[in-house]
């Protein structure tokens, strides 16, 4: 879908740049090749993007203008509605907002970008430092020591999927397996207190009325993912 929006809006000046936060260059390669991506598709194995822009989960989107200025705070923006019945994040409003901004029909954000941009707390920064230590140790053959730091990072930032889930493939844990679904279940049961869309693109019942989506349970999603090559 990112490729589709790139093809649609590139003639009007938009450049889509995707960054996969993954354990290796090979992990996202099949998805990039399957999409026949012609937009810049990068891989961040050190979690630098998540650190720089305080991203706690994916997908998180930033809009940057021609001057290199961030014109919209971190936002939740799914390009596909395949999992919308599970996440309850519909993409109708985010896509409409993006098109309107590119076509200069509306501002990028109606509020104060600086005031509404989510910044890390001291504990968040400590968690990312712990993750960085764990990552370095893992790259130097010290898996047991790395495990302690990854666990510590998750304890400091239980809300941060890029830390907790992001460490899973490095530690030999399936990032779409039981550990991830347990973590996602905790988030849902807690009322989804973090990783939420911005107010102007938040999902409403109207979105599902205008653009209905197929229902999918977590069990069905797991089965679908297991069946994919």
Question: Each PLM stretch: what is its role?
Answer:
Residues 29-58, 62-64:
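Short, internal strand/loop/helix patches
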Residues 124, 157-158:
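Short coil turns that delineate tetratricopeptide repeat
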Residues 131, 164-167:
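Alpha-solenoid helical repeat scaffolds
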Residues 1-34, 45-46:
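Structural microenvironment flanking redox-active thiols in thiol-disulfide oxidoreductases
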Residues 170-198, 210-211, 227:
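Alpha-helical linker/edge segments of TPR/alpha-solenoid repeat scaffolds
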Residues 65-142, 171:
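Thiol-/selenol-based redox modules, centered on thioredoxin-like
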């Amino acid at each position: 879908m990112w490729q589709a929006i790139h093809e649609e809006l590139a003639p009007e000046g938009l450049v889509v740049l995707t960054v996969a936060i993954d354990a290796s260059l090979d992990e996202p390669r099949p998805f990039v090749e399957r999409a026949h991506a012609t937009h810049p598709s990068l891989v961040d194995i050190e979690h630098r993007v998540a650190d720089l822009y305080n991203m706690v989960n994916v997908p998180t989107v930033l809009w940057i203008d021609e001057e290199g200025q961030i014109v919209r705070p971190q936002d939740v923006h799914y390009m596909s509605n395949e999992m919308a019945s599970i996440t309850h994040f519909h993409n109708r409003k985010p896509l409409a907002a993006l098109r309107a901004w590119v076509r200069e029909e509306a501002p990028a954000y109606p509020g104060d970008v600086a005031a509404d941009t989510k910044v890390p707390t001291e504990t968040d920064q400590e968690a990312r430092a712990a993750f960085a230590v764990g990552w370095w140790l893992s790259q130097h053959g010290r898996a047991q020591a790395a495990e302690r730091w990854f666990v510590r990072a998750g304890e400091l930032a239980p809300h941060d999927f890029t830390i907790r889930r992001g460490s899973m493939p490095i530690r030999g844990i399936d990032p779409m397996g039981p550990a991830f679904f347990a973590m996602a279940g905790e988030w849902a049961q807690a009322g989804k207190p973090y990783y939420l869309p911005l107010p102007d693109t938040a999902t409403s019942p109207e979105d599902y009325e205008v653009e209905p989506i197929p229902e999918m349970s977590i069990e069905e999603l797991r089965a679908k993912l297991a069946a994919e090559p």
